[in-house]
Swiss-Prot record:
It comes from Rhizobium meliloti (strain 1021) (Ensifer meliloti). GO terms for molecular function: ATP binding; phosphoribulokinase activity. Keywords: ATP-binding, Calvin cycle, Kinase, Nucleotide-binding, Plasmid, Transferase. The gene is cbbP. GO terms for biological process: reductive pentose-phosphate cycle. Pfam families: PRK (PF00485). It is an enzyme of class 2 (transferase). It comes from the Bacteria. This is Phosphoribulokinase. InterPro entries: P-loop_NTPase, PRK, PRK/URK. ATP binds at residues 12-20. It catalyses: D-ribulose 5-phosphate + ATP = D-ribulose 1,5-bisphosphate + ADP + H(+). Pathway: Carbohydrate biosynthesis; Calvin cycle. Belongs to the phosphoribulokinase family.
Length: 289
């Protein structure tokens, strides 16, 4: 953690909806005139697409499922050094992983490859969005560097539906290919992804209120209106629950540290919750300057 150079971390699995949360933060940053440096978790994959495919095949021959969820498939030591350096001096670097042709045109690199490393511009804070924002292993502790840690955790059937639809629509994969990826990733999901949500300050869990019992044949992603949000706070004593309940129509508290909100109020809920927290981080930063 660093009062002078705060770090916000959004952690979620593939298909969890972390990009939606990032979009809301970008709105807040623009409205509040806050400059942020951004890190995409994919930028710290250890291998490009072709090398990763070879590595998966090599490990499969040994009876091992090798996936992007694991620590070994990512440069977590480098990511931790970036977090630490930003926390100390407000500097660091990142790159982009190019997913498709649209991004290839934008970044000038082939799909499945990385762009060159680039230094951060001067910024008020650092924003990370990806798989490992709160990862703790035998060799790294990313959670210790973050000033605000947020988990995005849909119930798992909904997460799978979102992943299947996204990968088919934007990456051209078949349902069978996405299903195979989900199956291969399950041990790493349990060992590397889930434990991070016990370290977050706030978790957002979208829960569908329609039938999602077989996510592999679902023709539509449940809409926000067909969902509720369970929002859990690690330190509820610092949250103004009466204010949130008054501003978020039809919300209620399910536990002393949790509030349930209609699914179509996600953006409003995040803005009401995060804006004062960001202000606190920046007020602390300015006191240290």
């Amino acid at each position: 953690m660093s009062a002078k150079f705060p770090i916000i971390s959004i952690t979620g699995s593939s298909g969890a909806g972390t990009t939606t949360v990032k979009d809301t933060f970008e709105k807040i940053f623009k409205r509040e005139n806050i400059s942020a440096s951004f890190i995409e978790g994919d930028a710290f994959h250890r291998f490009d697409r072709e090398t990763m495919r070879s590595k998966i095949a090599e490990e499969k021959a040994r009876g091992v499922d090798f996936t992007h969820f694991s620590a070994e498939a990512n440069e977590l030591e480098i990511l931790e050094s970036v977090f630490a350096e930003y926390g100390r001096r407000g500097v660091g670097r990142t790159r982009h992983y190019v997913h498709d042709e649209a991004e290839a045109a934008k970044f000038g690199s082939d799909p499945g490859t990385f762009t060159d490393w680039e230094e951060f511009r001067d910024s008020d804070l650092l924003f990370y969005e990806g798989l490992h924002g709160c990862a703790v292993t035998d060799t790294v502790n990313l959670a210790q560097h973050c000033d605000l840690k947020i988990g995005v955790v849909p119930v798992i059937n909904l997460e799978w539906i979102q992943k299947i639809h996204r990968d088919k629509a934007t990456r051209g994969y078949s349902t069978e290919a996405v299903t195979d990826t989900i199956l291969r990733r399950m041990p790493d999901y349990v060992n590397y992804i889930c434990p991070q949500f016990s370290l977050t300050d706030i978790n957002f869990q979208r829960v569908p209120i329609v039938d999602t019992s077989n996510p592999f044949i679902a023709r539509w992603i449940p809409t926000p209106a067909e969902s509720i949000l369970v929002i859990r706070f690690a330190k509820p004593q610092s949250i103004d629950f009466p204010y949130l309940l008054s501003m978020l129509h039809n919300s209620y508290m399910s536990r002393a540290n949790s509030i349930v909100v209609p699914g179509d109020k996600l953006d409003l809920a995040m803005q009401l919750i995060f804006t004062p927290l960001i202000h606190k981080l920046l007020e602390r930063k300015h006191r240290m300057s």
